[in-house]
Amino acid sequence: MASANALGMIETKGLVGAIEAADAMVKAANVQLVGKEQVGGGLVTVMVRGDVGAVKAATDAGAAAAERVGELISVHVIPRPHFEVDAILPKVSAE
């Protein structure tokens, strides 16, 4: 069940910082990129799933990378999100 995995989120102002954060997160730890949400006003949130330790390491690396190239707004890890949270997350394609 996907909800057993932690959910990590990084929000940036601008797409470049979000892409840099996503790249750093998947390179830093064994996490799966869930997707991105463009919230409006230039805010972009990138999300990853994995075990708690991996997601924490990934968001730390992603936040540092985003700060180097853009504006970091927020970083948050939910250790065990309720399964109903999956309904509002982007769907992961099986490509």
Curated annotation (Swiss-Prot):
<comment type="subunit">
    <text>Homohexamer; has a positively charged pore 9 Angstroms in diameter. The hexamers pack into a two-dimensional array. May interact with EutQ.</text>
</comment>
<feature type="domain" description="BMC">
    <location>
        <begin position="6"/>
        <end position="90"/>
    </location>
</feature>
<dbReference type="InterPro" id="IPR000249">
    <property type="entry name" value="BMC_dom"/>
</dbReference>
<dbReference type="GO" id="GO:0031469">
    <property type="term" value="C:bacterial microcompartment"/>
</dbReference>
<comment type="function">
    <text>A component of the bacterial microcompartment (BMC) shell dedicated to ethanolamine degradation. Each homohexamer has a central pore with an opening of up to 9.0 Angstroms. Expression of the eut operon may allow this bacteria to use ethanolamine as a carbon, nitrogen and energy source. The pore probably allows metabolite passage into and out of the BMC.</text>
</comment>
<comment type="pathway">
    <text>Amine and polyamine degradation; ethanolamine degradation.</text>
</comment>
<protein>
    <recommendedName>
        <fullName>Bacterial microcompartment shell protein EutM</fullName>
    </recommendedName>
</protein>
<dbReference type="InterPro" id="IPR044872">
    <property type="entry name" value="CcmK/CsoS1_BMC"/>
</dbReference>
<comment type="similarity">
    <text>Belongs to the bacterial microcompartments protein family.</text>
</comment>
<dbReference type="Pfam" id="PF00936">
    <property type="entry name" value="BMC"/>
</dbReference>
<dbReference type="InterPro" id="IPR020808">
    <property type="entry name" value="Bact_microcomp_CS"/>
</dbReference>
<dbReference type="InterPro" id="IPR037233">
    <property type="entry name" value="CcmK-like_sf"/>
</dbReference>
<keyword id="KW-1283">Bacterial microcompartment</keyword>
<dbReference type="InterPro" id="IPR050575">
    <property type="entry name" value="BMC_shell"/>
</dbReference>
<dbReference type="GO" id="GO:0046336">
    <property type="term" value="P:ethanolamine catabolic process"/>
</dbReference>
